[in-house]
């Protein structure tokens, strides 16, 4: 069933090419109608395909998920009647790609955008894979996996191919409990690796030299294919530096990540970024394609951390220098649903943000229990410019709470409180700091990767970025947006979990993992199933350190241990910030 799902999400419709082509000229403009921007990284260069045509750029956006198959950009009667709506979708698709690729978000198919599209890349869609309620992350249900190489490269020896695959899986093995071993072709293996060209007996034909280099499917289907029309090499720095060949090892690490359940990363330095990264420096020296922190956080969020032991060579086929671990491991306890998705079992799983605050609990504690948690006491009279404030500059309640890169922000009624450490440093109108923001704010969320501050109110989301010149937050273009209909509840709290997942919470027992880039829900479930013993009414959390988070309800603060699922120290909000 999962294989069918992956196939469905990767396949796109091109039957409306004629209508779509009529839009292309509106977004190209011959170079004068749109701003220009430069490519973000020379390490992604590929001299064989300098740019894409307008028609291929259109197809690219469909192929890699920026225009969903359900949105055909054609009116109901089959005529190109709703041109304005189609233009909006197309421009949004271009901007999504530009943001994902790290280039200027012009909304036009400018030269920089088409040049980025021309880079060699993975064939897997950039759109996130949605998880249905009650399902687990795309992952293997066991830790010992086998792979077989069913066909071979026309450029490399079998030993070099074996070494590359063994090293690739060895890197993933070093940071997870997973173990990999090669078995002979034709065996019953978990992952089947092939080299093929053009139509090669799967739903996704290759495109010849350049463009798509390889593709793979999510667990537990185990499909892993390289395009044999590429010129492959194994760590040959001269060929790689001169753009004569593509490093098989780098591509194998990336595709191997897909076979383990990883999607594409928006971090352009990560192995799981969709674009091929040359493995040489400016002097032509080979640079080993190691996993980056983003890759490690993502894979450990699914499987947990490994033992840290060095990997050993494969026992099959005589590979030397490989990375697949074949040594025996102690039996481990099956992880909970919570651990499978949120990676709670290890203290060394860290947020990708820097923890700014060392929790400073006040000497005088105000412990609460039972029905007092998240009850919203003291929340009457919200909405006026002065409501929600008590003596000493402290709010009597909070509607939303979030950390950011420099400060934390507590929202109460029509006011926002800037907090440094455990001190309120400024109180001002929400509209002064966030022009055109809703009041009250029901939830707030800071995304350290994009630098966006998300505000939620009713069924809408507002995205802001901080202007260093104006010293206020300014709304991103394209916002506010209506939250996806499948969210199914009113947002009353939001938090960024230890491994980077962005979580929206209801006032009851529902939560959803949310991606604002695609405005999409990727997981829904019950809070009590994933966060046992977490009090109701959580508004936000401080940047977590290890497995312990500091969480805020409307008028309370408490510690929650994500590993033991237990409540620690507790305090009233006004006591916590020493007002």
Curated annotation (Swiss-Prot):
Q: Where does Zn(2+) 2 bind?
A: 122, 254, 258, 264
- Pfam families in alphabetical order: Peptidase_M10 (PF00413)
Q: Identify this protein by name.
A: Matrix metalloproteinase-C
As recorded in UniProt, its EC number(s) are 3.4.24.-
- One cellular component GO annotation, for this chain's record? extracellular space
- Enumerate the residue ranges of region (Disordered): 32-51, 307-394
Identify the stretches annotated as Hemopexin repeats.
Answer: 395-437, 438-490
Where along the chain is the active site annotated?
255
Q: Where is this motif: Cysteine switch?
A: 120-127
Low complexity composition bias: residue spans: 33-50, 325-341
Which residues get glycosylated?
A: 231
């Amino acid at each position: 069933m999962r294989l069918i799902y992956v196939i469905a999400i990767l396949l796109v419709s091109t039957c409306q090419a004629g209508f779509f082509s009529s839009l292309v000229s509106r977004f190209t403009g011959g170079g004068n109608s749109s701003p220009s921007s430069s490519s973000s990284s020379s390490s992604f260069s590929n001299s064989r395909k300098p740019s894409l045509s307008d028609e291929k750029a259109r197809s690219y956006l469909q192929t890699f998920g920026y225009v969903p198959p359900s949105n055909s950009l054609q009116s109901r009667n089959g005529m190109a009647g709703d041109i304005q709506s189609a233009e909006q979708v197309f421009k949004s698709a271009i901007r999504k790609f530009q943001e994902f690729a790290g280039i200027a978000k012009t909304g036009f198919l400018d030269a920089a955008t088409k040049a980025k599209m021309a880079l060699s890349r993975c064939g897997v869609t950039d759109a996130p894979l949605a998880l249905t309620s009650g399902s687990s992350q795309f992952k293997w249900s066991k830790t010992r996996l086998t792979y077989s190489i069913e066909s071979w490269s026309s450029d490399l020896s079998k030993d070099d191919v074996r070494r590359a695959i063994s090293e690739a899986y060895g890197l993933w093995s070093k940071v997870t409990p997973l173990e990999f071993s090669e078995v002979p072709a034709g065996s019953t293996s978990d992952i089947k690796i092939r080299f093929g060209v053009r139509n090669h007996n799967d739903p996704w034909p290759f495109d010849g030299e350049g463009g798509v280099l390889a593709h793979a499917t999510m667990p537990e289907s185990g499909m892993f294919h390289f395009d044999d029309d590429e010129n492959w090499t194994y760590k040959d720095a001269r060929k790689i530096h001169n753009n004569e060949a593509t490093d098989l090892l780098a591509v194998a690490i990336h595709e191997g990540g897909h076979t383990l359940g990883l999607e594409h990363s928006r971090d352009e330095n990560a192995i799981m970024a969709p674009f091929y990264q040359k493995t040489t420096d400016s002097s032509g020296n080979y640079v080993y394609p190691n996993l980056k922190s983003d890759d490690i956080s993502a894979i450990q969020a699914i499987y947990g951390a490994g033992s840290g032991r060095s990997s050993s060579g494969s026992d099959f086929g005589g590979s030397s220098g490989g990375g697949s671990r074949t040594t025996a491991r102690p039996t481990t306890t099956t992880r909970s649903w919570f651990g499978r998705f949120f990676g709670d079992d290890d203290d060394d799983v860290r947020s990708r943000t820097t923890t700014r605050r060392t929790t400073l609990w006040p000497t005088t504690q105000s412990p609460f229990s039972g029905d007092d948690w998240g009850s919203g006491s003291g929340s009457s009279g919200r909405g006026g410019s002065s409501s929600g404030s008590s003596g000493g500059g402290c709010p009597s309640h909070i509607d939303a709470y979030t950390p950011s890169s420099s400060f934390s922000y507590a929202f109460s009624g029509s006011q926002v409180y800037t907090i440094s450490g455990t001190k309120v440093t400024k109180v001002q109108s929400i509209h002064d700091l966030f022009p055109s923001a809703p009041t009250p704010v029901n939830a707030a969320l800071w995304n350290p990767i994009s630098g966006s501050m998300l505000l939620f109110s009713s069924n809408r989301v507002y995205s802001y970025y901080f202007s260093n010149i104006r010293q206020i937050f300014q709304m991103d273009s394209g916002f506010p947006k209506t939250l996806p209909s499948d969210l199914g509840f009113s947002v009353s709290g939001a938090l960024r979990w230890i491994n980077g997942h962005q979580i929206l919470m209801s006032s009851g027992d529902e939560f959803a993992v949310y991606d604002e880039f695609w405005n999409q829900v990727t997981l829904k479930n019950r809070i009590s199933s994933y966060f046992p013993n977490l009090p109701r009414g959580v508004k936000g959390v401080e940047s977590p350190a290890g497995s312990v988070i500091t969480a805020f309800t409307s008028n309370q603060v408490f510690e929650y241990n994500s590993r033991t699922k237990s409540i620690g120290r507790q305090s009233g909000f006004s006591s916590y910030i020493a007002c």
